């Protein structure tokens, strides 16, 4: 998550499959396809083996890690019922973009030894680096990795993770369009993905929109807590901001000739502290619970009705080595005792 105030202002001015059941207490019970992000930027995190046991105990079958961490991947050995998305570090992109041999070396060093007993289903090339100075490095690395896994007939999808800063305009959703830099860097990636219908991974955070303009954005609209139509866009009505942001990205892709490309929600969530009354456990719980119920309904979005979405909630733990404030408080669990900050599962 990298959101500058300027980008947020411009973006919002212009404007998993998760299957769940609610038990009698109102808590959410995860079924087999919900995903969680597993970040490691903390000095008080539990051991990876304990984290994997936590995932198993709450029915988590998909996780996303931001780099090929050996401790985590070793802890996942034998747990092939958990699908793993592994990220390529941003700082590795320059060397990997230089040659296909470098990519083969990276794969051999970081992925090869885990293929037999870890269920690696996605490799993501860079995290929110498009648009940006190293954005052009994403496409050649994706091409090399795609060629590699295809040549070996490996069931691993290659993609990248992008933020909504790629949108120059997002309101109303049908006006969604990419920035000029995104058109230069992202559209070739989207066209590569469309050749095999491989999803693009997107980070969607209604929280940042609400926090940047609470006077004009309703909390219930941002947190999935109203069924009333808040934004009418032609024949399409929006009762939550998540759908509006998602569909703005869909519209932007279509304007570049990329249609029907799947999208995976690589991150979404709401911080439970760090920004006063905007970030409480109650609001965070409301957003995440309502998000899961919304996705589980199978309704899709107004632009893509009745189409399921895969996704990952952000994040498993509060991470005390991230920037102070909200960034440290997106976790569902306290790392020191692994107790929930609020009950979700």
Curated annotation (Swiss-Prot):
Gene3D superfamilies in alphabetical order: Glycosidases
UniProt xrefs under InterPro entries: Glyco_hydro_17, Glyco_hydro_17_plant, Glycoside_hydrolase_SF
Cell location: Secreted
Cross-referenced PROSITE patterns: GLYCOSYL_HYDROL_F17 (PS00587)
UniProt catalytic activity: Hydrolysis of (1->3)-beta-D-glucosidic linkages in (1->3)-beta-D-glucans
A GO CC term attached to the entry: extracellular region
Enzyme type, top EC level: hydrolase
Signal peptide: 1-22
Any matching Pfam family: Glyco_hydro_17
E.C. designation(s): 3.2.1.39
Record: glycosylation sites: 23, 119, 277, 306
UniProt-listed SUPFAM superfamilies: (Trans)glycosidases (SSF51445)
Residue numbers annotated as active site: 128, 267
Keywords on record: Glycoprotein, Glycosidase, Hydrolase, Plant defense, Secreted, Signal
The keyword NADP is annotated on this UniProt entry: no
Regions crossing the membrane: none
A GO molecular-function annotation: glucan endo-1,3-beta-D-glucosidase activity
GO biological process: carbohydrate metabolic process; defense response
Function (record text): May play a role in plant defense against pathogens.
Family: Belongs to the glycosyl hydrolase 17 family.
Protein name as annotated: Probable glucan endo-1,3-beta-glucosidase BG4
Organism encoding this protein: Arabidopsis thaliana
């Amino acid at each position: 998550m990298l959101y500058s105030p300027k980008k947020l202002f411009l973006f919002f001015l212009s404007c998993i499959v998760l299957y769940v059941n609610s038990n009698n207490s109102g808590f959410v019970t995860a079924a087999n396809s919900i995903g969680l992000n597993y970040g490691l930027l903390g000095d008080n995190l539990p051991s990876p083996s304990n984290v994997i046991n936590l995932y198993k105990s709450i029915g988590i079958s998909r996780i996303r890690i931001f780099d090929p961490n050996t401790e985590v991947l070793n802890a996942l050995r034998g747990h092939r019922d958990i699908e793993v998305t592994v990220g390529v570090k941003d700082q590795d992109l320059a060397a990997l973009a230089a040659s296909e041999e470098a990519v083969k070396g990276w794969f051999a060093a970081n992925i090869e030894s885990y293929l037999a007993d870890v269920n690696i289903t996605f490799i993501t090339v860079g995290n929110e680096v498009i648009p940006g100075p190293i954005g052009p490095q994403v496409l050649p690395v994706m091409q090399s990795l795609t060629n590699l896994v295809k040549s070996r007939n490996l069931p691993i999808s290659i993609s990248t993770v992008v933020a909504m800063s790629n949108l120059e305009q997002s309101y109303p959703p049908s006006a969604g369009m990419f920035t000029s830099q995104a058109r230069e860097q992202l559209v070739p990636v989207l066209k590569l993905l469309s050749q095999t219908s491989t999803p693009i991974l997107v980070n969607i955070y209604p929280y940042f929109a609400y926090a940047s303009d609470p006077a004009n954005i309703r909390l219930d609209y941002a947190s999935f807590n109203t069924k009333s139509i808040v934004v009418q866009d032609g024949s399409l009505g929006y009762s939550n901001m998540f759908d509006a942001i998602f569909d703005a990205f869909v519209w932007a892709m279509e304007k570049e000739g990329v249609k029907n490309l799947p999208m995976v929600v690589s991150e979404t969530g709401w911080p439970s502290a760090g920004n006063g009354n905007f970030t409480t456990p109650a609001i965070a719980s409301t957003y995440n619970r309502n998000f899961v119920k919304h996705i589980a309904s199978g309704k899709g979005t107004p632009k893509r009705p009745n189409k399921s979405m895969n996704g990952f909630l952000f994040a498993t733990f509060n991470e005390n080595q991230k920037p102070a404030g909200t960034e440290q408080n997106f976790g569902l669990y306290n790392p020191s005792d692994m107790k929930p900050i609020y009950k979700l599962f």
